[in-house]
């Protein structure tokens, strides 16, 4: 399984859930992420999990070459796309960046998946904030 947004609240819970069920989990982490990875620190400090069943890969959603190379190499059966702008106030301060990351990043990821020989199942998780609620 591949998870984007693995360092977020939902991504960290999903990681724990998948690992508890015996899955190998690969997480995509933004290179420029300023967000704390504290939600998965307990997993990355566990030598029986980290780099055994949990692997982190650093790439931004606008880095099509790296993501394509990673997906071809890993050939995941499932992709859980949870990455997105999670700070509502910030999304209003930087609307173009938010759109680029959230909408265009998702589009790029879907285009790569569509071109794979064995496209994985794809779950895209959004937020009610998308609708201004």
Regions found by a protein language model. Name each.
Residues 1-133:
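N-terminal Rossmann-like NAD(P)+-binding domain of SDR-like oxidoreductases, especially those catalyzing
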């Amino acid at each position: 399984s591949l998870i984007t947004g693995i360092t977020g609240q939902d991504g960290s819970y999903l990681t724990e859930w998948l690992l508890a069920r015996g899955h190998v989990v690969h997480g995509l982490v933004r290179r420029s992420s300023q967000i704390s990875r504290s939600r998965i620190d307990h997993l990355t400090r566990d030598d029986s999990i980290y780099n055994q069943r949990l692997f982190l890969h650093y790439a931004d959603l606008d880095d099509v070459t790296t993501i394509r190379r990673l997906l071809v190499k890993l050939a995941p059966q499932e992709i859980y796309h949870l990455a997105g702008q999670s700070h509502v106030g910030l999304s209003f301060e930087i609307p173009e960046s938010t759109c680029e990351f959230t909408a265009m990043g998702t589009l790029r990821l879907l285009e790569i998946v569509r071109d794979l020989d064995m496209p994985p199942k794809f779950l895209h998780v959004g937020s009610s904030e998308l609708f201004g609620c």
